[in-house]
Amino acid sequence: MTSFRLANLTVFLVLLFCFMRGVHSADDLSKIPEIKGYELHCIEASGITESSAKKLRNGDDIASPDQSIKCYVQCFFSKLRLMNEKGVVQKDKVLSLLGKLMEEDKAKKLAEKCDLRRTNPCDTAYAMYDCYRQNKAKLL
């Protein structure tokens, strides 16, 4: 993976974890060997287009996300064990990760606010992701 793509993946991971100030945490995540394969695996598994994956990596707003976009996010959440194989959010793991990226009280508030349930795992994952993305400025 080129350094540019790895940098984009790191940016995406930071976005995925609410753009919090723990830059060193994103660097640490990018060094985990499994992370490097997640993007390619999740692109293939979800059927997302390269342009949509790029929008997610860049933190762009996606007005009408299709199922492939939602399932791409769900794939990452599943790989990071933030959701189990049935799409159930693993609250303890979400809190643990958020706690590494921000103050504990902010982590709890964000986890509560973004503990959203939808009709299927892909919709749930995307709703959570979008909540984190929308609330990042309020938590910095």
Swiss-Prot record:
Assigned keywords, A-Z: Behavior, Secreted, Signal
Q: Which Pfam families match?
A: PBP_GOBP (PF01395)
Q: What is its main location?
A: secreted
Q: Which residues form the signal peptide?
A: 1-25
Q: Which residues form a coiled coil?
A: none
Question: Could you mention a single GO BP entry for this protein?
Answer: sensory perception of smell
Q: Which SMART domains match?
A: PhBP
**SUPFAM superfamilies, sorted:** Insect pheromone/odorant-binding proteins
The conditions that induce or repress this protein are given as: (Microbial infection) Up-regulated in salivary glands following dengue virus type 2 infection. Up-regulated in chemosensory organs: antennae, palps and proboscis, following dengue virus type 2 infection.
Please give the InterPro entries that the UniProt record associates with this protein: PBP/GOBP, PBP_GOBP_sf
Has keyword Disulfide bond?
no
* Purpose: Involved in modulation of blood-feeding behavior and capacity in female mosquitoes. Required for normal oviposition. Required for normal fecundity and fertility of female mosquitoes. Required for normal expression of VGA1 gene, which encodes the egg yolk protein vitellogenin-A1. Required for normal female longevity when mosquitoes are maintained on regular sugar meal. (Microbial infection) Facilitates shedding of dengue virus type 2 particles into mosquito saliva. Does not affect dengue virus type 2 replication or infection prevalence in midgut and salivary glands at 14 days after blood feeding.
Tell me its family.
Answer: Belongs to the PBP/GOBP family.
The protein's name is: Odorant-binding protein 10
